[in-house]
Amino acid sequence: MNNLQQGKRIVSLHSIIIIIMQKYIETPRLILRDWKEEDIPFFARMNADPNVMEFFLNSLSSEESFAFYQRIQNEFQTCGFGLYAVERKEDHAFMGYTGLHQITFDVDFAPGIEIGWRLAHEYWGHGYAPEAATACLEYTRKQPDITELYSFTSLPNLRSERVMQKIGMTRMKEFDHPLVPADHPLRKHVLYHIKTG
């Protein structure tokens, strides 16, 4: 194979990767899609909202949200999966995210893959989170390399735990999150699990 042929092959392979990354998932009311730069201000506003971040250690600054956005993009590129932006069909509004994320901190269920979600406060209470998470879960069932998923949240976060239950996950146990200080009220987490393969 000469250099020109090699170059064509690389370009072709690169195009395939881009197409895979830009696939999106539709539900009756939502689109789970690749991120756009215009999502970033809405993403930052969501991550700065104390209602949304009630069960996290801190709200995020604009700079921290942008760094988070970059990590999401990197995970799609390196793993082939990640956190999709969630868009409402009726008005194309950015609502938050739902998708998959590698578990890399020191726990007995790592390495593993987490299914997670975060929606802006104005979209709570309408069933959007379980609708998006169910669509992501069903898409994952078609991926032979992913056979199980985990989800977890701090014990007081009953809203998120209810989403885990609604999408068919099973409660496994409680655990101390190693990245939360030992004396912090959010250290105790609950872990859910589901088989996908």
Question: Where are the regions that the model predicts?
Answer:
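Short loop/turn motifs at secondary-structure junctions and domain boundaries
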Residues: E75-C79
